[in-house]
Amino acid sequence: MPSILSIDGGGVRGIAGLVLMKRVQEALDVPWPLWRFFDFVVGTSVGGVIALDLAIGQHSLEQSIARFLGWVSDIFPAPPSGMPVWRHKLRQFWAWVARDSIYDSERLENVMKEAFGKTQHLFSVEGQHWSGIKLGIMATEVSRSELRIFTNYNGIGRCESDSGKPTDMTDWQNVKFRTGYKLLRPPVVDEEPLVFEVARATVAAPPYFRPKQLRGHEPVQDGGLRANNPSEQALWELSAIWPGHARPSLVLSVGTGYHDTPPHKLATQSAWRSRGMPRIVRSFMMSPCLHGQNSWKALLNRLDHSARKSFIRLNLEFEDEEPALDNAAEIPSLRARAESCYIDVVLSQTSIWASAFFFELTGRPQLFCGYYICHGVILCKFEDARQLLRAIRKAYPLHQLAVGTQGLVEFGTAGDYCGECGLFQQRIRLETKTLLTPVDVALHYDTHTRRHLSSFPNSIEWFVARQSASGEFRTWESVMRCACKRTSRKRRVTWTSSSIPKRRRCY
């Protein structure tokens, strides 16, 4: 099953999200970046720019933090020294009236051009990272105030016409219609948006910046007006990108900070805050569309208890009011708070590790003495799994694999991977009375920590249907094989197709 990385918007508070991800990255203790563990990366506003910088720019989190600080200093210049606050606010107000933006929108565009180049398209050969990771960047259409998503993929049910029916679909019966939002894909290839244009559009928050006009589209503005936390929107897209995958194996949602007013302060709020206009503004700002944390709570309320275990939220709680989106002076404080605040790093670490492993049947189930015997193999998303196995072994020396009802077995031993190329393949056997009964395989780190592998728990029937989608039963051996010279299972990987990436698309 696919995994999702979602990054909230929040202006300068984006530094908090970067630092929180960096803390998880350090806990993973692997040489590749955090985002490579995920199949679908989505972002809104500054979260969208960060997603582009990581997945398209292929920068590390350390590099992205440094680049972020440079962008902020260029886009949000400090007020003149000695200028009274009231006068600075008055200047900003008149700038907004005169040019429809407080800050220079041309400067923002130039910063994005310098960051992402002037020629790279989001949907192009060079824009598609070899890993095959899908990207979704949120925006809001100005005229209708509806959600739009920039993508580097098509999906089966690409978009809807004004009549509400899909304009391009390959399977009319099985495509899940997109309702209330569309993918921003132009009718002709020449009008494909450039990466810097997508970055410029997703952060065009009123009144700070003007909307962005793109060829072949209506003007668009900040995606945070409709989905400041794009986690749920990513779930909407799952069935269009990966038909047959109704739920993700893991969702890591990264916030940029929030503030909950304590009850005792609510009881003593001024009479002015209880009047009509402040109530309207407060309700608007706290709505799930704009408030990332409230959006997350609403999403969890729609999930059952078992599904919630796959949803992880990283966020920072402020004791006082949230810093303004353009308050660059708060960045040092934001960074320090994000480095010291509590987040469940162990939950993120162990869940991400487990999501990197998935199961494939090596043959159809066989009925024997009232039980279906199912032979299969545990594989890894990464071609070379040695560094990942080393990190798991270092943190949890006694880790094992919990296989269905059979109990615990060894996991990641020297006989389960190639010592020359690192290809991981651990064969296991599952037993079940019915093909429709969910079975489970999990990484058992210690007596208190156990995480499901990708696609578990699930029925054997689900695996059979997935591997038979093309009409014939396909196994991992039909996609790749290891051809290293045999020296106690030391083998080299030989891909049967040159299009297969180093990070596998099988999950």
What do the predicted segments below correspond to?
Residues 1-507:
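Conserved catalytic cores and adjacent C-terminal regulatory segments
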